Amino acid sequence: MYRTMMSGKLHRATVTEANLNYVGSITIDEDLIDAVGMLPNEKVQIVNNNNGARLETYIIPGKRGSGVICLNGAAARLVQEGDKVIIISYKMMSDQEAASHEPKVAVLNDQNKIEQMLGNEPARTIL
């Protein structure tokens, strides 16, 4: 049996831009992509903390160190600049792999710089 497990998460990223006229996707600072083991063109889920919207799209790498988090195309209708979002990637794995799997979670500050790296999510609330 295979399970779909969270593999990486950018927690509380700040949307820096919403570009309705670009062809779909989310542009993410390449340093952030690397930090949580995501890949260009990988499918991700995005959860908007401000309005509850959830959507799926794919990653386009943005300039390293820029802090860019830009929702493109139709996704731009579901966010506004300054919104806090959670960006999640998932992997399929066997029960055996899942038993020892530790996702990479980056908690970001308001400038989309990594404040803290976590493995398994803590049992406490992170604000």
From Swiss-Prot:
Pathway assigned to this chain's UniProt record: Cofactor biosynthesis; (R)-pantothenate biosynthesis; beta-alanine from L-aspartate: step 1/1
Family annotation (CDD domains): Asp_decarbox (cd06919)
Subcellular location field: Cytoplasm
Substrates-to-products reaction catalysed: L-aspartate + H(+) = beta-alanine + CO2
Function: Catalyzes the pyruvoyl-dependent decarboxylation of aspartate to produce beta-alanine.
Any one of the GO CC terms: cytosol
Protein name: Aspartate 1-decarboxylase
Subunit (UniProt): Heterooctamer of four alpha and four beta subunits.
Cofactor-binding details, from the entry: Binds 1 pyruvoyl group covalently per subunit.
Post-translational modification: Is synthesized initially as an inactive proenzyme, which is activated by self-cleavage at a specific serine bond to produce a beta-subunit with a hydroxyl group at its C-terminus and an alpha-subunit with a pyruvoyl group at its N-terminus.
GO terms of molecular function: aspartate 1-decarboxylase activity
